[in-house]
C-alpha cells in the first residue's frame, strides 16, 4: 500500500524535505478501508457500471471481477437474451454500437481501466489494492463496462443516455461517471464557454439526460435486494471553480470533489454548490517538490490499473475529480456488498443519507494558505502559486467518504430482507435462491410449505428452489430455514405473468 495512500494513509508518505519542510500527509486521510475490510471486501452480487473508456477486461487485476451477461454470446451479432443489445457479454460499446469493448485505441488514456481498478482490482494477488475488489478466495464486486468514449470519439449526449438506461436494465446499482460538463462558474478564459448555470437550465436543455438519471435512480436495484433504486456518482469537475459541473450537480446524483493526502482540497477541484462529498483524487501540483523529472509529484496522485498499451507495467498514476469519483463508487459498492451479506435492505435515498452522515469531517484541515505549482500553458512554464483555503471551508460537501463508518451504520439501519412474493406465469416456472434472503443463508437448508398446491408447487435443486405455476389463483406460502427463521410470502399464478418472479 506504499503507493496507495488513498486507501491506507499512515501519514508518513510526504514528510518534510529541504524544499518543503511541512508534512503534506495526515494519518487517516484516506477512505478508511483497512478496518472496513474486516467486515467486507466486496460481493459479486453488486454491479458497478463504469461509463467511460472501455475497461481492459484482460487485465490480471480486473479479469475476475468483470461482469458477465450469462444469457449472451461473446461476439454475437444476434441479441440472444432479448435485451435489445447484441453480443453484450461484458457490457456494451455505445460509441460503435456493438458488444465489443475496446481499450487499445491509439488515443485512449486508460481512464476507464484506471477508475475500475480503484473500485474493483482484485486484492491479495501480488498487485494493487482496491476498495471492493475482493480476493482470489472471496470475489469482489463486478464491473460492467458501458463504453461512451473511444480515443477521440464518443461522449455524445445520446450515448450516455443509452448507457445509463442499459446499466439500470441489466443489473447495475451504481453508476461510476468520471465525466461531466464544464462548471457554470468556470473561468471562460481558461475553459471556454461555461456549462449549465443551475439545475433548472440543465433539466431544460438536457431533458433526456435528466430522464435517464431519474430512471436509474428509481428503477435500478430491487425491492428484494440490498437496494431499491440506484446511486449515480459523478466527478464534480477540475476547473478550479466554485460550483460543481452537471450532471453531477443535479439533486439525484452524488457529486465528488477531490482531496490531497492531508485532507486539503486538491488544487484543481470544483467545490461549492452541487458538491456532495469528497474523496482522494491526488494533487500533482501540490506534491511537485517530491520526485524528479517526469516523476515529479506522481506520488501525490492515485495509483491504479492501466491497459498495457498505455503502461508497460499495467499500472500508473492519475489525478482529478475523475479519480476521486471511483473512491465514492467503490465505498458505495463495498457498503452494498456488506448490506447484501448482512441481508439488509435500503432505498437509494436511505443509503445516500447514510453515505453523507458517515463522512469524515475535514473542515479543520481546510485553513490557512496552500502553496503549489501550476503550469501556465499560455506562458509555457511552471508558476508557484497559492490558494486561500478559507474559500473551501464548508464547500467540499459533507466531508470525506468513510468506508468503515458507512459499514457500521449499515449494520444498524435499513430493514431485514424478506423472501419475496412470487408472480408465476401459468404453466411456467420461477427460480429463486433462498440463501440470499437469510443471514448466513449459504450454510442453511430450507423447507417450503404451500397452502394450496393445486395453484403452485416447489422443488429444490441444489441451492435453488424452483416454483411452478399450475392453476390461476393465489396461495399463501412460507419458507423455513434450518436456523429457525421463517418467512411468509404469497404466490400468484396468472396467464399474463411476465415470468420475472417478483411482485
Regions found by a protein language model. Give the residues of each.
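Catalytic-core segments of hydrolase enzymes
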Residues: 49, 115, 173-298, 303-304, ...
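Subtilisin-like serine protease catalytic core
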Residues: 34-157, 170, 180-185, 227-228, ...
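Primarily auto-inhibitory N-terminal propeptides
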Residues: 1-21, 34-37, 165
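Hydrolase catalytic cores
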Residues: 118-119, 144-150, 165, 173, ...
Amino acid at each position: 500500500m506504499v503507493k496507495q495512500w488513498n486507501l491506507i494513509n499512515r501519514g508518513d508518505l510526504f514528510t518534510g524535505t529541504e524544499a518543503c519542510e511541512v508534512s503534506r500527509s495526515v494519518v487517516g486521510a484516506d477512505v478508511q478501508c483497512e478496518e472496513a475490510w474486516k467486515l467486507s471486501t466486496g460481493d459479486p452480487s453488486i454491479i458497478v457500471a463504469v461509463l467511460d473508456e472501455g475497461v481492459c477486461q484482460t487485465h490480471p487485476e480486473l479479469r475476475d471481477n468483470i461482469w458477465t451477461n450469462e444469457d449472451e454470446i461473446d461476439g454475437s451479432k444476434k441479441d440472444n437474451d432479448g435485451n435489445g443489445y447484441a453480443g453484450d457479454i461484458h457490457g456494451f460499446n455505445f460509441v460503435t454500437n456493438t458488444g465489443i469493448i475496446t481499450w487499445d485505441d491509439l488515443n485512449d488514456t486508460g481512464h476507464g481501466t484506471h477508475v475500475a481498478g480503484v473500485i474493483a482490482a482484485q486484492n491479495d494477488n501480488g498487485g494493487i489494492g482496491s476498495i471492493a475488489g475482493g480476493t482470489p478466495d472471496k470475489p469482489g464486486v463486478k464491473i460492467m463496462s458501458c463504453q461512451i468514449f473511444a480515443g477521440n470519439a464518443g461522449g455524445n449526449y445520446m450515448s450516455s443516455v443509452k448507457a445509463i438506461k442499459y446499466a439500470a436494465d441489466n443489473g447495475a446499482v451504481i453508476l461510476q461517471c468520471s465525466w461531466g460538463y464544464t462548471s457554470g462558474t468556470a473561468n471562460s478564459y481558461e475553459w471556454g464557454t461555461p456549462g449549465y448555470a443551475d439545475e433548472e437550465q440543465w433539466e431544460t436543455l438536457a431533458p433526456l439526460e435528466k430522464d435517464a438519471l431519474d430512471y436509474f435512480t428509481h428503477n435500478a436495484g430491487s425491492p428484494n435486494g440490498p437496494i431499491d433504486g440506484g446511486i449515480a456518482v459523478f466527478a464534480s469537475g477540475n476547473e478550479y471553480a466554485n460550483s460543481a459541473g452537471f450532471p453531477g450537480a443535479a439533486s439525484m446524483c452524488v457529486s465528488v470533489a477531490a482531496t490531497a493526502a492531508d485532507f486539503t482540497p486538491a488544487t484543481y477541484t470544483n467545490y461549492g454548490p452541487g458538491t456532495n462529498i469528497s474523496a482522494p483524487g491526488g494533487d500533482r501540483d501540490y506534491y511537485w517538490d517530491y520526485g524528479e523529472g517526469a516523476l515529479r509529484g506522481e506520488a501525490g496522485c492515485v495509483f491504479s490499473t492501466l491497459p498495457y498499451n498505455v503502461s508497460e507495467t499495467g499500472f500508473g498514476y492519475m489525478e482529478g475529480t475523475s479519480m476521486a469519483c471511483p473512491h465514492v463508487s467503490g465505498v458505495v459498492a463495498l457498503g452494498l456488498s456488506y448490506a447484501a451479506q448482512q441481508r439488509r435492505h435500503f432505498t437509494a435515498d436511505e443509503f445516500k443519507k447514510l453515505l453523507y452522515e458517515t463522512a469524515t469531517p475535514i473542515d479543520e484541515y481546510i485553513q490557512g494558505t496552500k502553496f503549489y505549482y501550476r503550469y501556465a500553458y499560455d506562458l509555457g512554464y511552471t508558476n508557484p502559486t497559492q490558494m486561500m483555503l478559507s474559500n473551501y471551508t464548508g464547500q467540499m460537501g459533507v466531508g470525506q467518504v468513510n468506508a468503515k463508518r458507512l459499514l457500521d451504520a449499515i449494520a444498524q439501519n435499513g430493514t431485514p430482507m424478506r423472501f419475496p412474493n412470487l408472480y408465476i406465469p401459468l404453466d411456467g416456472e420461477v427460480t429463486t435462491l433462498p440463501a440470499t434472503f437469510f443471514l448466513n443463508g449459504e450454510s442453511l437448508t430450507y423447507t417450503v410449505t404451500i397452502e394450496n398446491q393445486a395453484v403452485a408447487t416447489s422443488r429444490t435443486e441444489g441451492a435453488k428452489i424452483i416454483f411452478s405455476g399450475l392453476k390461476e389463483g393465489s396461495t399463501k406460502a412460507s419458507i423455513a430455514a434450518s436456523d429457525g427463521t421463517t418467512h411468509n410470502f404469497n404466490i400468484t399464478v396468472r396467464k399474463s405473468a411476465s415470468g420475472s418472479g417478483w411482485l
